[in-house]
Structures are given as structure tokens and as C-alpha cells.
């Protein structure tokens, strides 16, 4: 079959390593006589680099539900969310997001117990996102049904779902998730600080931040052949633009334990980046918070976030920290933009194609994000005119 992105999941099942190919070509019979070998340049033998994209928190508040509802078709339309920023997630080899809602089914609801229509995750997937992180403080909002139906719907759609599990055996078989992309193996780990005081229903598993467990997960990921290990952590304090000491300590510990890079979420605002250099001279990127993608939150900095691009396994960069870049975007509420639905506008988007009210709002958001990022280690800033790998 054909698909936009070709990569394989590597899962540990019992004592066997099973390769599950997401895009497989028909097998061809081997020729009776091997053709003469043709000299190949060294560069052609090396695997192609991997282009990664990370997005922040995919929220779904009550006003978003109402704005997305199509009363004529009796369905929900979330495609406007990604109309102007979906190009990047579609071009990436792997695009990762934090799905901070459950897919319990009807009745749908916003804060404080999120239950979103299936159309929401389908729109996110249609925008090019392949990896859905589900270990966050809202994953237990709707109990067992919310957790298990979310898992089932994402997996049934052929998406990589990471962070919550039906039971302990499900976790053993599926975690850590190791993917083979362009000849490279990479693993995404996902953990949350908590679940708003809710506990998993007996049997269900949520990946909480537990250093003993995480250390074992890193070892297991490497044993499965992971060349790169990236930890995606739900942590920090909401609406605070700088990481706290707990975040910094955990990031440093993760790197010391063998994680290559750390990407954070939960504060719902952008937080700066840090490059941690280990004694072997390797540089490891930590981005403490990507902010929101779309939400109806009201505090300064909630109405947008940043997309983080990264290149792994490239000869053009000494490490991923060298090749990393970010682009800010703003997602105004319809009552401010005059649009029917929520839509994200990236930095540098043509003013002539935006509502008049959005021109200044986008500029203000970008300036705020730039100010926040200036407090950390520098990574390249891009915009609509020069974004990409």
C-alpha cells in the first residue's frame, strides 16, 4: 500500500523482536543469479537523516467544540486548525503531538473533563501527525472508558500511541516504542507528573514520572536498538514562562541516564531551550515547553505556541542541537479574529491573508515567544518564509 510516511514500529513481544511495517511493498522473488556489484559512494550507503517535528498541547475546550460543529452536516470540522501550519507536519518524517483530551465518545465535554469527538484526532492525523502522546494530567478525565477508547481509536487508525496502556502486559509488549525511520531507530518515551488526583482504574497503566522506571525504560529502548532516545515529559507549572528547578533537575538526570533529547509540555506557554553538554562532548537539546497548539485558555501566552524542528542522523550538523529550529504561531479565538473556527497563523504569515485584528496579535505573540526563548540557549528561529528542514 502507499502512504505518506514510511517507518516501522519495533515491539518486544514475549522474547521475540517483531517488526511491524506501516508501509510495505510487495515481495519480489530473488533472482537466480546475483547481478554484478556496482560501486556505491560512501554517502549513498549512509541512512538518510530523520526530520522530526514536535507540537505542544492539543486542547479541546467547550467553545472549541461549539465552533467546530457543523449543524448542517451534523459533524465536527477541525481542519481550519492546521490550514496554515500543517505543511510542516506533513513534510516531517515523524510528527509528534500531545493529545491532551480523551476520546470517550458522547457526551462530548471541555474543561475540566475533556472528551472530544473522534473527528478531532482524525484532523490532527490528517495534518500529518503520526505519534500521539497520551501520558498527561487529563488522560484519566473519563476513567477507564476514556483511557481505553482513546488507546483503541488511535491504534485502530494506525497511529503510534505512547504513554498510557490497557494493562501491564500491554505496556510490556508496546513500550518503549522504537521506530525505524530512514534506516535509523529512534524511541519516544512519555511520562506525566500526575493525573489531577485521579488514579488509574485497576489494571490500566499511566506512565508517571518515576526515575527507577524511566531508567529501566531507557535501557530497554537501547536493547531494542534505539539509536536516538527522546523523552517527552508532561511537567512544570501552568502559565509560567520559565522552567522550575524540578524540571531542570529531571532534564539533567534524563540526559545522564542516556536520553538524547527532552521535549516538554503542560505549562501551556512557551518555555526556553537548554543545551546540556555531557563529558563525552555530546550536546543534548532540552525544550522545556512548546506551549499550546489550539486552546480556549485565557492567560497571556496560552493562545499559541511553537513548532520545533529537529534533524537526526545528518552529516550536516554535529548533533541535533545544531540542526534544531523553532517557529512561533498564534491561534486567536473566533470572537477576536472574526473567523468561524480557531486557526493558527505562523510567524511571518502574509498580513494580507489574515484578519486585520490578527496582524498585531500575531506580532505581539511572536515578540513574547522570542523574549522567552532568549532566556535560554539559542536555537534557530524560523518563520513562514523560511521554515522547514
Residue ranges with predicted function:
Residues 24-389:
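Acidic, metal/ion-coordinating pockets
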